[in-house]
């Protein structure tokens, strides 16, 4: 009887100790890849911060201060990530948490301050030096870069020329086409390939940028 009482008491105390764990993502309750800094707070009663080990199923977690960590993920191989928290003193698993991993928003292509299908004055159009990508409504400091794009230049007489450009800034061939802009000409930027943060995957925008020179 005493033995059963001891086991029951130990189980209750052990479960109570395990319950003294607070883990929270500071911004939103999901993780984002591409190197976004997913900041998190971890507090475990009776376990010094220096004895905590945080093991992510993928990505990397860095301690930035007492109880505060940053979880960074590059590629998104799955939409679920698991965090295991251990006590370094006895290698005991204190808690296991599961989080959803969301894709970052699709960036929006811009030419200067203009979006797709806006008419562009000739002089203003020629002063632009390249395309840019903007992440809207995304509360993380993350940059997306253009890998390459194709430009189709269609004159008012319907003559057409296509050039490929590596990177965001105009190369010499594309710059030459930009300099030819006249009223009624059309410039279509398409097959825009991009990469965000540390995510190695090259993706393509579904939207094109099409401008008519006025």
Indicate residue ranges for each PLM-predicted region.
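Short beta-strand elements
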Residues: 93-108, 199-214
């Amino acid at each position: 009887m005493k033995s059963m009482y001891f086991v029951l008491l130990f189980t209750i105390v052990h479960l109570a100790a395990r319950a003294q764990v607070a883990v929270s993502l500071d911004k939103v309750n999901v993780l984002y890849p591409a190197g976004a800094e997913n900041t998190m707070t971890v507090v475990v009663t009776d376990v010094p911060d220096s004895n905590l080990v945080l093991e992510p199923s993928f990505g990397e977690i860095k301690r930035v201060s007492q109880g505060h960590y940053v979880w960074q993920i590059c590629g998104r191989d799955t939409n679920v990530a698991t965090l295991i928290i251990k006590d370094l003193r006895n290698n005991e698993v204190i808690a296991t948490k599961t989080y959803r991993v969301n894709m970052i928003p699709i960036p929006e292509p811009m030419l200067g301050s203009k979006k797709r299908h806006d008419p562009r004055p000739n002089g203003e159009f020629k002063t632009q030096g390249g395309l840019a990508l903007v992440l809207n409504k995304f509360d993380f400091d993350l940059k997306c870069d253009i890998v390459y794009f194709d430009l189709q230049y269609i004159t008012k007489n319907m003559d057409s020329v296509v050039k490929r450009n590596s990177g965001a800034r105009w190369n010499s061939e594309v710059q030459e086409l930009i300099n030819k802009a006249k009223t009624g000409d059309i410039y279509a930027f398409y097959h825009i390939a991009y990469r965000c943060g540390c995510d190695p995957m090259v993706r393509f925008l579904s939207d094109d940028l099409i401008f008519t020179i006025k």
